[in-house]
């Protein structure tokens, strides 16, 4: 391929790359900004199982956090 053909191909690819994001915008952006990312506590493993918790508490998992919590009872 000649250098002129290569430059033409490169130019067309650049133009195509610029047009894709514009055509993908079906709706305008909503007003306002996103709030800061909520801060999550670090992964803490307070317990390994129900028996490692005091009294009637259970070892409850919330994502990567394991903590002793009072149980709830559902009828």
From Swiss-Prot:
Keywords: Antibiotic, Antimicrobial, Disulfide bond, Secreted, Signal. Residues 1-24 form the signal peptide. Disulfide bonds join 34-60, 43-64, 47-59, 53-68. It is found in: Secreted. Residues 27-72 form the WAP domain. One of its GO terms (biological process) is antibacterial humoral response. GO terms for cellular component: extracellular region; extracellular space. Its main location: secreted. SMART domains: WAP (SM00217). It comes from the Eukaryota. Expressed by the venom gland. InterPro entries: Elafin-like_sf, WAP_dom, WAP_four-disulfide_core. PROSITE patterns: WAP. The keyword Methyltransferase does not apply. GO terms for molecular function: serine-type endopeptidase inhibitor activity. The keyword Magnesium does not apply. It holds the Pfam family WAP. Damages membranes of susceptible bacteria. Has no hemolytic activity. Not toxic to mice. Does not inhibit the proteinases elastase and cathepsin G. Belongs to the venom waprin family. This is Stewaprin-a. It comes from Hoplocephalus stephensii.
């Amino acid at each position: 391929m000649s250098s002129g053909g290569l430059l033409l191909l490169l130019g067309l690819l650049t133009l195509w790359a610029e047009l894709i994001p514009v055509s993908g915008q079906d709706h305008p952006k909503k007003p306002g900004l996103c709030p800061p990312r909520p801060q999550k506590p670090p992964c803490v493993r307070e317990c390994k199982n129900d028996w490692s918790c005091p009294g009637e508490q259970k070892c409850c998992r919330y994502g990567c956090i394991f903590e002793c919590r009072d149980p709830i009872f559902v009828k």
